[in-house]
Amino acid sequence: MHARVVRNQIQPGKLDEWLALIQESIVPALKGQHGFQGFVAMIDREHDKSIGYSMWDSEADLAASEASGNYQQQIAKLGSVLAGSPARDVYEVTVVA
């Protein structure tokens, strides 16, 4: 299993809007992608930061999601609430408890 981790700096006062976009638009779009396993969102209200990570059956499924343009489309939906470009990393998931 592999995970894409995206760290965001959110504009002040926009965390709830970010969360609504995640729940109403981004997660449903992810659910339609082959190999998608789940999504977790975390927020730091004090510092206007968020982290979202999506889990995928394989590195190939994650890469296919990005190659299809899906990742870029979803990030574009967040443009009105982000304060800068998101930082993206990919990890192999080694322990799930």
Where in this protein do the model-derived segments appear?
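Short S/T/G/P-rich N-terminal loop/turn motif that feeds into the first structured element of a domain
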Residues: 1-53, 57-69, 80-97
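A common structural junction motif
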Residues: 72-74
